[in-house]
Structures are given as C-alpha cells and as structure tokens.
C-alpha cells in the first residue's frame, strides 16, 4: 500500500529546489512536505478501505449465489486494498478458504494456505483455525486437525464446532492406537502466536543492535564502512553467498537486515514452540495484599518455587512458603513432596495459591536441592516476564513495553484495592462457607415430602422439554424437504427429469425423518398435541408429493402409487383428528380448573413459589383458544380439499363427501362465504372451472393467512411451537412435479 504514497513523495520532492533546508530536512519546507504527504496517504487509504469493504459485500453476495470464483476474485482484490494489519484481512482470507473448500477436495491445500495467511494477520481468529482443521481432517492429516481444534478449545472452551471436530478426530486416532492423551497434554496450554508481532520484535532488536554498533565508530569513512559491513555480514542470503557491503551501500544493508529478520523469526517461533511443550500450571503468589501470577511446571521442585518467588519479590531476604489446607490452616512447605501434596489438595479450586510469609534469613528452612540449576534459573527468568496483573499469555512481547505495562497496571490495582477495601481471599472463603451451609440445608429439603411434588413438576417439565427437542428436530427435516431444484438453462428434458427425480427422493427421505422425530416426541409425551398436528401436516405434504410424482405414469385406483397416496391421507387425517381431540380436552380441563397447570400453580402457592408461572387473563385465553381452533380447522380443511381432488381423479365416489367436510372446516375456521364459494366453484369436478387452470387451495389459504395475519398474530397463538407449522408454505417441488409430469411431454 506504500507505492502510491511513494510516488507522490518523489514528485513533490523533484519540484522542490535543492536548497539546504530541503536536503537536510531542517527547514519549514520539509515539514510542510511531510504533512501534505501524510494527509494524501490518509485520504488514499480511506478510499482504499471503503472500496475494500464494498468488494467484501459483493463477494458475500456472490458466495450466497454459489459463484465461488467471482466471490474469491472480490475477496482477493479487497485484501490487496487493505493494510496488512487491518481487522478484515483475516476474515477475507478465511472467506477465500471457504470458496476453495466449496470447489472440491482438490482445492483444500489452497484453502489451508489461505487459512495460514489469515492466521498471520490475526493469530487468534478461531474461524480460520476451524476451517484449516476441517481441511486437514478431509485430507487425513488427523494430527494437524487435532492440534488446530485443540488450540481453538484452549481459547474458546464452549466452541461447539471445535469440540465436534476434536472428538471426531480423537476417536479416529484412538482407533489407530495413537496415544491422544499425551498429544492433548502437550497442547492443553498452547495458544496461537502471530508472526507479525514476532517480526516487529526482531526488527526492534536489530535496530537497537545497529544503533549500538554505530555509536562505537569514530565518525570516519572507514568506521562507517566497517559498521555497515559488520551488519551485512551478519545477515546471510538464502543461497549462502555473502555480499560485499562496501560497494552496495545502504540499500543492500536494509535488504540484508530484512533477511536476518526472517531468519530470526524462525528462531523465535521455534523457541516459542519448544517452550510451549512444557506443561505448566497457573500459580498465585500471595504476599500480604500483593498477589502475583506465575507459571510453574507440573513437576516443579520446591527449590524452583523458591527461586521464582525470589525473582518475583526481590526485596524479601527470607521467607516461608505456605499453603492453605482443607481445614483452613496455613501449612509450611519444606520439601517437594509437600509441594505436590499441596497442589493435589487445591486442584479443584482452579488456581493454586502459595502464601509467602517474610522471616529473617536465619529462620528460613533448608530446602531439598536439585542438580539442574541451569533449568531453574532459566525458568525463573522466564516466569519473571509474566505480568503482575495476571496476564499469563504465551505471546512474546518486547521487554520495555512489558515492564511499562506491568508497572502501570500493578499501581492501578493496588490503588483500587486500597480505595474500595477489596480482598479477594475473603470472597473465596465466604463462598466456601456458603456452599457448605447450602449443601447441608439442601440435604434436609430434598428428602422432605414437599420436595417430591416439586420433583414431579420438574420431571414433567423436563419430559416436555425432551419432547419439544424431538419436535424441533422434526421441524428441521421439514425445512430441509423444501430444498429448491435448480435447472440448467440449456438442459435437456432427460437432465431435468434426473434433477426432478433426485429432488423427489431427497424430499421423501426428509419427510420420513421428520415423521420419525414427531413420532418420537409423542412417545416421550403422549399428550404432546403439537407433534401430532405437525405429523399430520408432514403426512399431508408427503401425500401431495407422491401424488404429483405418480402423475408421471398411468394413475388408477389399482396402482400401488395411488394406494400409497390414500394411505398417507388416511394417516394424516388420523393424526390431525387425534391432535385436535387432545387439544380440546386440555382446553376443557383448563376451563374447569383441573388442568396440570392449575395443579402445579396450587402447589407452588402453598410453597410460596407462585410467581414462577405466568398466567394470561380470561379474555386473552378465550381469544387465543379461538385463534388456535381457527388455524387447526384451516389446516384440516386444506387436507380434505386436496384429498377430494385425488379421489375425484381416481374415480372414487367419496370425493364429494370429502369436499363437504372440507367446506365445514373452512366455515369453522372463519373463512368468508365468498371465498368458500370461489373455492368450490373452481374444484376440478365443477363444470364451471376454468379449463387448463388448476385451482390451488394453498394459494387461497396463504391469502387468508396474509389477510388476517396482523390481527391474529397481534393477539397471539397459545403455543409458539406451532407458529412455523401455521406459517408454512407449500413446497415449490410440488408445482415442479405437477408441471413436469402432467404438462406436455
């Protein structure tokens, strides 16, 4: 993004006279030049960012239209317009990875590359990690998929997608005999590290080194040439050749410094990975009001702990290390075994606390010694870089910035604690005491007689919740059955028939799955009338689907397809009738004050818990009952009307009876006499029906719903679960089947 700015700077510079002020940068002209260049750069950058956001939206729209190449082209242009550190770069790279994944398994390596670029821009972008894990899983690189999903879970323990991938890959690895527990142990504290941040740190270190070497020279040409050669010789090119710095000058020096940055990047990343392999635990070091974080290995010794404490509290001359046992006493730790015992007793609290008590040096106990002094010093130094405010992240930070941040936050925390009198330890003790008293009190309550009735209410609610889960699961399959079929513009009839047949099998399979879930809901809760009504709707739609599909061949009463359609209509009527009956019985019990709700309400009032359930007024309940009855009768009438058409075309004499009952249901639903007359007039049995114009009951039902929609849904339906059922439109696949099989061949 620096090229346009560079051109403007060069143009402005050439127009300026080569005066001393312009050359040295000490005059006003140089300052105005910098200000104008910065303003021009900001204006251009704003334009580029706005254009990139427009390209991102265009790419999203093309992705929704399944134009993955076009979407990828827009995303790529947007990335090129944005700065490298912009927040949308990771999102755009991940979107490009999604496009590659949609284009087939052969493009998965490209998707992985885009995810890598996204993680360079934003190392903690979990979506990129998840997509890369899916690609690795599909490419059978299960160890990489295991790593990425584990890293996401380290950042977001409640991430459902990451947990699914992790468990799935873990199961396969266990089946192959791989020790996944050891792998998981090594990854439990691993966090993503950004290459951009590491590169910045390394450049800063090189800048300091260069400045130091420059100050050591005497100012002569020979001294300058030696300092430049020293820096350039320290940085090797990829093919291993050394460059003569005396002839190349400053440009080659900067290039070599960049090469050295890349080499040091790899070294820093490698050292970071090596350090992450050590499994550590989080420890709180408590010295009066001063509480500091530290990271200690799981197998750390008491000598290592002592050295870390000395490093964190350098003012202490002598001290005792203590822990609080299960009885609340502070016990002094003198050996490594005692340290491990203390860690095991406090495992359930999440963080391990060590209390430091200052004593004179001659009162300090003699700790058991270890031989690995070098590793102890190394870890003590590493732990000292952890922020005092509790920041224990794995990211590498510059020493100067880290020290400044620690000092400011620590001062603020101390000031805040002193001002408000905050004591974190007392809160934890109060919590433990409260939980102990709560457990003892609950033991007496749950064994009483009143608790058994409350348990019955809770069991009934959980039973209804389980049935509702199956009901919603069935609704998902009903929605999947509405999948639209897309035909190619230049497709032949054979291609269209293949597409239609595939769509029919898909919808039929989803209808069967939905029926299975609805039946499961009724098995869990026998009076769950919503599932019965939904089952009737499912069987009704499946009957229509099979009927339109049967039109592709000879249709008569003896054919198997016709018999299947009539059986589905019979089942749909039975489900609708049973659901209506259960609902009417529940309404009757509610009006008489003997419903389960009234029983539960009376019991809760005795226990002083009457505010748990809310109850509608009598007027609202009456309106809700009328609306529910209207909707059920409307659904039932549509079913009977469609059945009368099927029976008429099959030559069954019972078609007129079905039509009469359908009219009765529409009247009970509150349909106007004009609408009913139009519906009867356009029945396929009527001589007045328009020839070649098939009347669709779905269309008039939809019109009724839209006409009275605002009024009905303002009042509300007493069961929100049935709203998707009542608002459901007829699938377009039915019309496609009818047009393909009953139209001109």
Curated annotation (Swiss-Prot):
Localisation per UniProt entry: Cytoplasmic vesicle membrane
Disulphide bridges: none
One GO MF term: myosin XI tail binding
Keywords noted in UniProt: Cytoplasmic vesicle, Membrane, Repeat, TPR repeat
Domain PB1 residue range list: 280-359
Predominant cellular place of this UniProt entry's protein: membrane
Bias (Basic residues): 1-10
Cellular component GO terms held in the UniProt record: cytoplasmic vesicle membrane
Chain positions of TPR repeats: 52-85, 90-125, 126-159, 406-441, 443-472, 494-528, 553-586
Stretches for region Disordered: 1-37
Highest taxon in the source lineage: Eukaryota
Matching InterPro entries: PB1-like, PB1_dom, PHOX1-4, TPR-like_helical_dom_sf, TPR_rpt
A UniProt-annotated Pfam family: PB1
Alphabetical list of CDD domains matching this protein: PB1
Residue ranges of coiled coil: none
Observed effect of gene inactivation: No clumped-chloroplasts phenotype. 31% reduction in root hair growth. Phox1 and phox4 double mutants show no clumped-chloroplasts phenotype, but a 46% reduction in root hair growth. Phox1, phox3 and phox4 triple mutants and phox1, phox2, phox3 and phox4 quadruple mutants show a 70% reduction in root hair growth.
Membrane protein topology class: Peripheral membrane protein
Family annotation (SUPFAM superfamilies): CAD & PB1 domains, TPR-like
Function summary: Carboxylate clamp type tetratricopeptide repeat protein that may act as a potential Hsp90/Hsp70 co-chaperone. Contributes to polar growth of root hairs.
Subunit structure: Interacts with myosin XI-1 and XI-K.
Name of the protein: Protein PHOX1
Organism phylogeny: Eukaryota, Viridiplantae, Streptophyta, Embryophyta, Tracheophyta
């Amino acid at each position: 993004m620096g090229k346009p700015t560079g051109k403007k700077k060069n143009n402005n510079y050439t127009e300026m006279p080569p005066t001393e002020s312009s050359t040295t940068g000490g005059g006003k002209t140089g300052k105005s030049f910098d200000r104008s260049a910065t303003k021009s750069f900001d204006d251009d950058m704003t334009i580029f960012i706005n254009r990139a956001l427009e390209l991102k939206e265009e790419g999203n729209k093309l992705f929704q239209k399944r134009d993955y190449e076009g979407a990828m082209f827009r995303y790529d242009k947007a990335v090129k317009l944005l700065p490298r550190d912009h927040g949308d770069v990771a999102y755009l790279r991940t979107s490009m990875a999604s496009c590659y994944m949609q284009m087939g398994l052969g493009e998965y390596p490209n998707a992985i590359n885009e995810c890598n670029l996204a993680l360079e821009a934003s190392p903690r972008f979990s979506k990129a990690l998840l997509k890369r894990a899916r690609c690795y899983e599909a490419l059978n690189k299960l160890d990489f998929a295991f790593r990425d999903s584990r890293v996401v879970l380290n950042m977001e323990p409640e991430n459902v997608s990451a947990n699914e991938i992790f468990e799935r890959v873990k199961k396969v690895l266990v089946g192959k005999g791989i020790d996944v527990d050891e792998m998981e142990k090594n990854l439990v504290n691993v966090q993503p590290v950004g290459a951009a941040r590491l590169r910045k740190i390394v450049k800063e270190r090189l800048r300091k080194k260069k400045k130091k070497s420059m100050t050591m020279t005497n100012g002569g040409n020979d001294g300058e040439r030696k300092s430049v050669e020293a820096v350039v010789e320290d940085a090797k090119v990829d093919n291993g050749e050394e460059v003569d710095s005396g002839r190349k000058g400053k440009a080659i020096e900067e290039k070599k410094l960049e090469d050295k940055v890349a080499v040091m990047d790899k070294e820093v990343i490698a050292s970071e990975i090596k350090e992450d392999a050590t499994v550590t635990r989080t420890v709180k070091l408590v010295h009066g009001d001063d509480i500091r974080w530290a990271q200690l290995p799981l197998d750390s010794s008491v000598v290592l702990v002592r050295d870390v404490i000395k490093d964190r509290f350098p003012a202490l001359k002598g001290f005792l290390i203590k822990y609080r046992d299960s009885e609340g006493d502070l016990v002094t730790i003198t050996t490594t075994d005692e340290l491990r015992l203390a860690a095991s007793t406090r495992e359930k609290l999440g963080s391990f606390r060590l209390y430091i008590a200052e004593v004179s040096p001659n009162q300090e106990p003699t700790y058991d010694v270890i031989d690995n002094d070098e590793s102890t010093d190394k870890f003590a130094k590493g732990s000292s870089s952890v922020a005092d405010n509790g920041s224990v992240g794995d990211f590498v930070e510059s020493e100067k910035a880290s020290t400044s941040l620690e000092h400011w936050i620590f001062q603020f925390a101390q000031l805040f604690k002193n001002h408000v009198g905050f004591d974190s330890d007392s809160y934890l003790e109060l919590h433990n005491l409260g939980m102990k008293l709560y457990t003892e009190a609950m033991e007496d309550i749950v064994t009483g007689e009143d608790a058994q009735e409350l348990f019955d209410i809770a069991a009934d609610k959980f039973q209804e919740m389980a049935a509702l889960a199956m009901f919603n699961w069935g609704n998902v399959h009903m929605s999947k059955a509405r999948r639209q079929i897309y035909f190619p513009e230049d497709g032949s009839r054979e291609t269209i028939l293949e597409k239609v047949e595939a769509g029919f099998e898909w919808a039929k399979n989803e209808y069967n799955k939905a029926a299975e879930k609805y039946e499961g809901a009724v098995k869990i809760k026998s009076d769950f009338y919503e599932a019965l009504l939904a089952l009737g709707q499912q069987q009704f739609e499946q009957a229509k689907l099979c009927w339109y599909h049967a039109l592709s061949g000879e249709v008569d009463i003896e054919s198997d397809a016709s018999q299947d359609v009539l059986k589905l209509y019979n089942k749909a009527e039975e489900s609708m009738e049973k659901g209506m009956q259960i609902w009417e019985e529940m309404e009757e019990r509610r009006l008489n004050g003997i419903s389960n709700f009234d029983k539960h309400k009376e019991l809760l009032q005795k226990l002083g818990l009457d505010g748990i359930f809310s109850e509608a007024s009598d007027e609202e309940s009456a309106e809700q009952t009328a609306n529910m009855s209207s909707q059920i009768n409307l659904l039932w009438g549509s079913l009977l009307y469609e059945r009368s058409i099927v029976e008429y075309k099959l030559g069954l004499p019972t078609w007129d009876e079905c039509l009469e009952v359908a009219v009765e249901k529409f009247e009970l639903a509150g349909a106007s006499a004009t609408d009913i007359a139009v519906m009867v007039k356009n029945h396929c049995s009527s001589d007045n029906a328009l020839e070649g114009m098939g009347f669709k009951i779905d269309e008039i039902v939809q019109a009724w719903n839209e006409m009275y929609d605002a009024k009905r849904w303002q009042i509300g339906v007493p069961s929100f679960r049935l709203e998707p059922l009542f608002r459901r439109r007829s699938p377009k696949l039915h019309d496609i089947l009818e047009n393909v099989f009953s139209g001109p061949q």
